[in-house]
């Protein structure tokens, strides 16, 4: 049995009883990485020297002081688009191949305040653009459940590392499903918080109105622990919300009697695989057995979500990625005769194909002749999608459906068909457009590959999302299933 089979509360008890040391946890993490990461390829950079030194320091603090951080001694992996001082941050892109940040992201600082131990940086789709982690310039991360399949994306490294037992917890980012989709594919728990719940300061921007950092864990309880540690307003991020952070752990009561669940017919219709549909219907029976009720509803504008998302996110990416020019930091071409040539060649050589595709799409949508027809119209449709969610939440407590239309697909299966690849996020994208919280929890297997149940809540009501997810988790054994590596 791995130490990482224990929850945070159990690990903290073992530490305080002196049955294990924090150094043991860190050692377990690096040993596991050494044993399996040549197959999984989740990590891009390790911070072993600093992590081991910090673990020893925390070991001495077990008796040395009475107050300890919320995540005292817990090893964690961080997605490679979250800046870490003194630890290379590349966004899995050649254009940032040697970028060594001079500051920590707010979430990293909050992890340090909670006394977590950063193990290393995790692979991802370049600049978080992708659904399979096949767009990384450095590594091809594989799904621990089947090494021939993708782990999902863009936080594929974050989900795969937790599923493979390399770290018990990780941070990812979610712009259109990039935490929930890989969590579903890898059989772990992943939450996208409400937009503004967690500071984005130090998150390398893809689409600033959609990006949100969130936790990936083995259990719902651990997920709530991590969100507790990283949530809250931040003066360095004007989009972080000045709202109270509730005690998320207190919501894990297991009691969902009388809870009203909405199930959108669009989430179980055309394009959703039989296995995903059946796993959700089975999950609804479990929730009914716990005292909740459910009804079918409609989110009529969700059929426009995919097009809306790719217009808006690509437009924002076009603006955000303009800063990578070969002048200030990152990669610079050697094949330029003048300044304009330097810009062109640096970006042509430094960005991968998917990133260039989205920059071009965004630049086109923002151009003078097409702004009203595309970008402005997409903003209007986004408002309608948000209104659909608001209307449903007037009557219901949560929305439930599959996280993904299918389980993980084979590596290389969709790389030549961007539209098929984009459709993998069709059930997660509306949640980002509406800015509401959503979680994926394991709800079964199809041909040996995990499936995820998506639970969506009202703005800043992660507590109810956690309550439902935890009740389902406790009533089933899906979260106990682990891949054999």
From Swiss-Prot:
BP GO terms, sorted: translation
Top EC class, one word: ligase
Keyword terms of this UniProt record: ATP-binding, Ligase, Nucleotide-binding, Protein biosynthesis
Keyword Ligase belongs to the record: yes
Domain of life where this protein originates: Bacteria
Catalytic reactions on record: L-glutamyl-tRNA(Gln) + L-glutamine + ATP + H2O = L-glutaminyl-tRNA(Gln) + L-glutamate + ADP + phosphate + H(+)
Family: Belongs to the amidase family. GatA subfamily.
Subunit organization: Heterotrimer of A, B and C subunits. Interacts with BrxC.
HAMAP family xrefs: GatA
Role played: Allows the formation of correctly charged Gln-tRNA(Gln) through the transamidation of misacylated Glu-tRNA(Gln) in organisms which lack glutaminyl-tRNA synthetase. The reaction takes place in the presence of glutamine and ATP through an activated gamma-phospho-Glu-tRNA(Gln).
Protein name: Glutamyl-tRNA(Gln) amidotransferase subunit A
Source organism of the structure: Bacillus subtilis (strain 168)
Gene: gatA
